[in-house]
From Swiss-Prot:
Record keywords: Activator, Early protein, G1/S host cell cycle checkpoint dysregulation by virus, Host-virus interaction, Inhibition of host innate immune response by virus, Inhibition of host interferon signaling pathway by virus, Inhibition of host STAT1 by virus, Interferon antiviral system evasion, Metal-binding, Modulation of host cell cycle by virus, Transcription, Transcription regulation, Viral immunoevasion, Zinc, Zinc-finger
Role, per record: E1A protein has both transforming and trans-activating activities. Plays a role in viral genome replication by driving entry of quiescent cells into the cell cycle. Disrupts the function of host retinoblastoma protein RB1/pRb and isoform early E1A 26 kDa protein stabilizes TP53, which are key regulators of the cell cycle. Induces the disassembly of the E2F1 transcription factors from RB1 by direct competition for the same binding site on RB1, with subsequent transcriptional activation of E2F1-regulated S-phase genes.
GO aspect biological process, one term: symbiont-mediated suppression of host innate immune response
Species this protein is from: Murine adenovirus A serotype 1
Name of this chain's protein: Early E1A 21 kDa protein
Disulfide topology: none
Length: 200
């Protein structure tokens, strides 16, 4: 079972998450979380992205159901194909109804509501086994009905507000295609904390 999450990110959080993935790849001590070292099938797959007039970005992303459980419990997650415990696979199947729930359109990342939108495959071992994501012949991203999220995100990067000191930095190939969900969640939580402090 995999989930599709629809959410909105502020451009600041989106760019910060991209920067976090660059830092993690260059410096292993940066942004250490229980999510570090998880298999690549936990990577977020962006299937739709749109920049709105107010500067926020609407995203549709797909990730394994077991990843949701790991985020909630803040514990490491092992791919069910390599896990020795029977608890992890059951977390991705037994806790979710077989009937898809309606998608939740949220106004901000901090207020996101994780819902099961559709079962993309009867019982995928990992998201990489789902055949609806053929590789893009242009960039190696993933196509959905002829739409390549990575090519589209590269085009959107130029539309997003850039920090003054980030003008010379280019988005690496993997940052748009394989953003870790825990990285996004961590940055969103920090963003919410900062907003709360300002309100006080």
């Amino acid at each position: 079972m995999s989930r599709l999450l629809r959410l909105s990110l502020s451009s600041r959080v989106w760019l910060a998450a991209q920067e976090a993935t660059r830092n993690v790849s260059e410096d292993p001590v940066v942004c250490r979380t229980p999510w570090d070292g998880s298999p690549t099938c936990t990577a977020v797959r962006v299937v739709r992205a749109e920049v709105l007039a107010d500067g926020t970005m609407d995203l549709d992303i797909v990730f394994p159901e077991a990843a949701v459980q790991a985020v909630f419990s803040r514990t490491p997650w092992q791919d069910s194909t390599t896990a020795t415990s029977a608890e992890e696979p059951s977390a991705s199947t037994d806790s979710i109804s077989s009937d898809p729930l309606p998608i939740s359109c949220v106004e901000s990342f901090e207020d996101m509501d994780l819902r099961c939108y559709e079962q993309l495959s009867p019982s995928p071992e990992s998201i990489e086994t789902i055949e609806v994501f053929p590789p893009c012949s242009t960039c190696g991203g993933h196509e959905v009905n002829g739409f390549c999220s990575l090519c589209y995100l590269r085009g959107l990067t130029d539309l997003l507000p850039q920090a003054d000191d980030a003008g010379e930095a280019e988005v690496p190939d993997e940052s748009a295609k394989d953003l870790c969900f825990m990285d996004l969640l961590t940055w969103a939580m920090e963003d919410k904390t900062e907003c709360s402090r300002h309100d006080e």
